[in-house]
Amino acid sequence: MALLAAAALVVAACGNDDDGDDTAADEAADEAADEEATDTGDTGRTVTIAASVPPTDHGWLGQIAAKAQEAAEQWDDVQFRLVEADDADDQASQIQTLINEQPDAIVVLPYDGEQLTPVAEQAMEAGIPVVNVDRLFATPDAARATILGDNYDIGVKAAEFIAEQLDCEGNVVEIQGIAGISVTEDRTQGFADKIQELCGNGIDLLAQQPADFLPDRGLEVMEAILQANDNIDAVYTHDDDMSEGIVAAIENAGREDEMILTGAGGSCNAFDRIEEGGLYAATYLYSPTMAGSAVNLARLIAQGEGMTDLVEPEVPSEIIVPPTQVTQDNVDELRPLCFE
């Protein structure tokens, strides 16, 4: 599995942390110790890693925090602190405080990548490497490394699935995440580009509205769309947790047999729905394990180490995790990857 492989790559460390004042004997001993650490995953220099995330107010973000904490706890040489922000302004203030505390690295899943770019750049300028998760900063200078899912490809794969199911004819609704962030824009653009390529004008996009990744907002938005449209063939949603509200609206209206729905994220609730068959036809894995991988990357960078499976001595600047489509055909096989 590509997602598991990406996560596995960042778990083990390799490096050569020699001191220029060491004697030749000491240098040889250091090199031998480094080689042993490469093979066994032994601890290195103790580092302090801070993580800043948005409110963990739905399942995926809750798992982001949990996976980051789990990864940090695997290492005896990591001191870890996670802070949650109420909004983008609060997060910027929190990161400024973290900069003043001088951790060895900061992991950031920004509330809004563009708005948080200046403070991330400040951290980098202060010599604190930043690992960017999920929502991109506005400039590459704001992070030493970035790990994210391929949001554009989620849109592409959803378009391919819906185009096939509808035979490129029908009415589609798109329920987006948070307006203006890179995740939403990429998922929307990937879908738009692919559906146009495959179907031309055969698919009519009836509505396209954000619901902020929240189930309650999904319910409200979908209720209004259902009232305004008598014939809907498919719903492309950006998030499985948000889709719980969307599904509730459709079922409350008694219209679940009229349409199909695709999600994104890989929640266990979505897996259950897909296994049952009917309305919820597919989702796309966008695993919160990337937060754990981000902590592992931050550890390697802070310790000046690289990744054992790569020839290059430094951690790559970008890791993109491809989405995996989940349907009735493979839901049982992929169930270990879902999140509660």
Give a label for each model feature.
Residues 14-27, 31:
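Bacterial lipoprotein signal-peptidase II cleavage site
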Residues 59-74, 154-158, 182-202, 217, ...:
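Short, solvent-exposed amphipathic alpha-helices that sit
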Residues 72-84, 172-174, 197-213:
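Short beta-strand elements in bilobed, periplasmic/extracellular small-molecule ligand-binding domains
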